[in-house]
A protein has these predicted regions:
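C-terminal substrate-binding/catalytic lobe of Rossmann-fold NAD(P)-dependent oxidoreductases
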Residues: 3-10, 15-68, 148-268
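Short beta->alpha connector loops at strand-helix junctions that form conserved
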Residues: 11, 100-102, 127
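Short glycine-rich anion-binding loops that position phosphate/pyrophosphate groups of nucleotides
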Residues: 41, 80-81, 103-104, 128-129, ...
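Rossmann-fold NAD(P) dinucleotide-binding segment
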Residues: 66-69, 73, 77, 81-100
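Rossmann-fold NAD(P)-binding glycine/threonine-rich loop
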Residues: 85-88, 92-93, 101-123, 139-141
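Residue-level detector of anion-binding/catalytic polar loops
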Residues: 96, 122, 149
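Rossmann-like NAD(P)H-binding beta-loop-alpha module
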Residues: 135-147, 163
């Protein structure tokens, strides 16, 4: 029988961290061996905090002990700067990062890619692990060839720190690359309230909504003569991200170098 994948989870007491622990605990080929938190949950059993019962893994408060349990993979949903710090420590230790937190800069990604290449070890960074969200981005890329007029509305819970979301930025980049032309504005716009038309990424307006009761949602709205096309994805709870996260956790061990975006794993 093959050995189980040894998994560590950072941000273990957060919403995504707890969901990841539940998902890992339910897999016959995985086992949780380490967990990292900040304040909430530190010193408690990770399984108890996640709601699946004691797993015998205590949530640590400092990353220094994270690799003592010799994990194969580090699942990390901490914000960008902390995730970068964890990855820089993980890769030299032979631990493969699977990062879902947003906020990493291009310089951060380039540095992590270089580190992974030098150590010949895999890593996955994905703005969104929901398979439906990946398909939404792909469908939007296809639609952009025929509908160059497009705007993006992304909606998230009110605890999300970054705006716009990484998914919205990645969608804008994919749409911009696929468009055969950039349409001019129909009129010269005058914003009587600054920011009313949203922020622009790759020339595409993005509108961010943050409200209690939301989880993660995005609409990509295309317009053409006499018609509109809306491509929408909704994550109604954290479980929507788990199939993609588990796929990345299994596949990262066979990778050499950094993969950015879950779609790269679906294509291979």
């Amino acid at each position: 029988m093959a050995e189980k994948i040894r998994v560590a989870v950072a941000a273990a007491a957060g919403r995504m961290g707890r969901a990841a622990i539940r998902a890992v605990a339910a897999q016959p080929d995985m086992m949780l061996v380490a967990a990292l938190g900040r304040q909430h949950g530190v010193g408690q059993d990770a399984g108890t905090v996640a709601g699946v019962g004691a797993l015998g893994v205590t949530i640590a408060g400092t990353p220094g002990t994270l690799f003592d349990a010799k994990p194969d993979v580090l699942i990390d949903f901490t914000p960008g700067p902390a995730a970068v710090e964890h990855a820089r420590a993980a890769v030299p230790a032979g631990v493969r990062p699977v990062i879902g937190g947003t906020g990493m800069s291009q310089a951060d990604l380039d540095a992590l890619a270089a580190l992974c290449a030098s150590k010949r070890i895999g890593a996955v960074v994905a703005p969104n692990f929901a398979l439906g969200a990946v398909l939404m981005m792909e469908f939007s890329r296809q639609a952009a060839k025929y509908f160059p007029h497009v705007e993006i509305i992304e909606l998230h819970h009110d605890h999300k720190r970054d705006a716009p979301s990484g998914t919205a930025l990645k969608t804008a980049a994919a749409v911009a690359a696929a468009r055969t032309s950039v349409p001019p504005l129909a009129v010269k716009e005058e914003q009587t309230l600054q920011g009313a038309r949203g922020a622009r990424a790759e020339g595409i307006p993005i509108h961010s909504v943050r409200l209690p009761g939301l989880v993660a949602h995005q609409e990509v709205i295309f317009g053409g003569p006499g018609q509109t096309l809306t491509i929408r994805h909704d994550s109604v709870n954290e479980e929507s991200f788990m199939p993609g996260l588990l796929l990345a956790t299994r596949r990262v061990r066979s990778l050499t170098g950094l993969i950015f975006g879950l779609e790269k794993l679906l294509e291979s």
